[in-house]
Structure formats: C-alpha cells, structure tokens
Design a protein with these regions (language model features):
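Short, Lys/Arg-rich N-terminal segment immediately upstream of the first membrane anchor
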Residues: 1-8
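Hydrophobic membrane-insertion alpha-helices, especially the h-region
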Residues: 10-25
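Short linear S-[DN]-x-LW-Φ motif typified by the pepsin-like aspartic protease active-site region
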Residues: 25-137, 145, 149-164, 171-177, ...
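Structural recognition of beta-strand segments within beta-rich domains
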Residues: 98-100, 204, 243
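Residue-level signal for short, function-critical loop segments
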Residues: 102, 169, 188, 207, ...
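Short, surface-exposed interaction patches in beta-rich subdomains
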Residues: 139, 193-196, 200-202, 209-306
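Acidic/histidine-rich helix-loop elements
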Residues: 142
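Right-handed parallel beta-helix
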Residues: 164-213
C-alpha cells in the first residue's frame, strides 16, 4: 500500500477520535434534548399504483397528501400513543437506502403491509420513497435522546433488489432479509446482521466493524482499511478480500477444496484454519474462487467441512 494512503488512513482515524471527544464534551454540558412523546409513522400499501412516501421533501412529484387525525381507537394502519397516523396508497419500493450518522437503528421484517418508523429519536430521521427506493436519512445538527433506538419495520413479503446501509458512527442491526444485492459500509460505526440472503454482498469498513452471521451470498467483496469484518455462513462463487490495515474473518460452511486461490500476503497475514499461507496460487479445479490481499492487515478463513 502506498505511503500517502497510509497517512490518509491515519489522519482519518485521528479526526474520528477528535469528533467523538467533542461529542462527549457536548453531552456532558447538557447537549442532549429530552423528548416527551414517542411518535410513529405508518405507511400503508393499498391497491393504487401511485408512489407512497413519508416526510417527502417539498415540491416533489411523488409527494402525497398526508392524512393526519386524532383518534381514540385503532385505525386501519395502526395508531400510536399520540394518535397520529399517516397513510399512503401506492406500490412497494424495490430498493432501500439507509444513511445513519450517530443513532442506533434496528431494521426488522413485519407481518403487516405497513412500513413503520418508531422510537424516541424517530424525528431525527427523514424517511421517504422516491423512484422505487425507500430512503432513511439522519437529519443534520439535531440533538438526540440518550438511549433512544429507532426501529424501522418493513413488510416481510417485500422483494428487494438492493439494500444499502452506511453507518458513519452509528449502530445498525438487521435480521432475516433477502435481496439481489447488499452493500454495507461502516466508517467508525458498526453493522450487525443475521439471516441474510443475497447474490452479491459488498462490505467495507474504515475504522468501524461489520458482523454478519448465518448468511448466504454467491459473491463477497470485503475491504477492511483499519476496521474489522466478520462473516459466517456460505459463499458459493467468489470471494474478493482486501485487508489493508484491518482484519477480515470468514467462517464458511464449505471445504477448502471448494475454491481456487490467489493469495498476496505482502506485509500482512493470511491463514486457513489457523495455518499461515504465503503468497501463492492454488488450483483445485473448483467452481469457487478467492482473491486474498492482506496488504498490512489480517485475513483468517475457517472451513467447517475440513
């Protein structure tokens, strides 16, 4: 790895550490805002083929009329403690894009045909649908309530083409989702998931961490600059792993003989079942392939069938 890139990574880590220090100072001086009420937003899918949305940006063609009313009893799409309900008719989104800076977010599948956004910090997020994509974005410069978790519930029957999550300094958790493609990135934050199924899985960390368990993918791209990536499950076709200064650990349900290998350990380390492997090309005439590059980092692969 080139020297300028090493200095860039080191500088990024220093800046991130300084940012956390400033956040801590602000918190200790009373910078947290208490929220008296927890409001949830509901999106209900009907038979119409129009777009749907929640907190749409102003003046967009996809904006729909907000139906808000006070109620003492349950309504079709649900009610919360404040009695505020927002209902839209429309088509299901095909993509989901999540961008979280500092909050704690959980994404779960639900049995109803509604998208529900709840939690004490719900008003710190913009949530809307545009061009068949569900967007959830953290607002800038908003005080957050300590310990407040945001929960995004989406219908479990939804057929996702792509799920993209960016956790800058946030914590994001999800479980039991499938999509054609998934792309997760963690700056200084963390992403935890289990029960994922996808054709293509892209994982990248700077100084953060991504942990996936009991998951399946045909292709995996993993890039760890200075953070950590942990994956357990099965990869059937292709693994492309690059550990610059970071750590990548794969626990695969297959055998070592199920893959061909191109290994470049450089100044780092590559291990199969705890045994170091030097720079080499290994041909098993297998259907799966691995390209492993541990520039100055560490790559560990464990095979359950060996």
């Amino acid at each position: 790895m080139k020297n300028w890139k090493k200095w860039m990574i080191a500088g990024s880590i220093i800046c991130i550490a300084a940012g956390f220090l400033l956040i801590g100072i602000g918190s200790s001086m009373g910078g947290w805002k208490n929220i008296d009420k927890i409001n949830s937003r509901y999106i209900h899918f009907g038979d119409s083929d129009t777009f749907i949305g929640l907190n749409f940006p102003a003046n967009t063609t996809e904006s729909q009329q907000i139906l808000s009313r006070e109620t003492d009893s349950p309504v079709d799409v649900g009610s919360d403690s404040s009695g505020e309900v927002i209902s839209f008719n429309g088509k299901l989104p095909e993509k989901m894009e999540i961008s979280a800076s500092t909050l704690a977010l959980k994404i779960v599948p639900g049995k109803s045909d509604a998208i529900i956004l709840g939690g004490s910090n719900r008003d710190k997020m913009n949530c809307y649908i545009k061009d068949d994509c569900l967007y959830l974005e953290e607002k800038n410069h908003k005080p957050i309530q300590k310990g407040g978790e945001i929960v995004l519930t989406v219908p479990e029957s939804m057929d996702w083409k792509k799920i993209e999550i960016d956790a800058e300094a946030a914590y994001v958790a999800l479980q039991d989702f499938s999509a054609e493609e998934m792309e997760f990135s963690a700056g200084a934050g963390s992403i935890e998931a289990s029960g994922l199924q996808t054709k293509k899985l892209i994982l990248s960390v700077e100084a953060g961490a991504i942990t996936l368990t009991d998951s399946e993918a045909a292709e995996l791209e993993a890039d760890a600059e200075a953070g950590a990536i942990h994956f357990s499950g099965s990869i059937t076709d292709m693994v492309d792993a690059d550990a610059e200064l970071g750590n990548i650990v794969l626990k695969l349900s297959q055998s070592k003989d199920d893959f061909d290998y191109e290994i470049d350990s450089d100044l780092g380390n590559v291990e199969f079942d705890g045994i170091s492997v030097e720079n080499s090309v290994i041909c098993n005439k297998a259907s799966g392939k691995m390209n492993l590059d541990s520039s100055m980092g560490n790559i560990e692969i464990y095979f359950e069938q060996d």
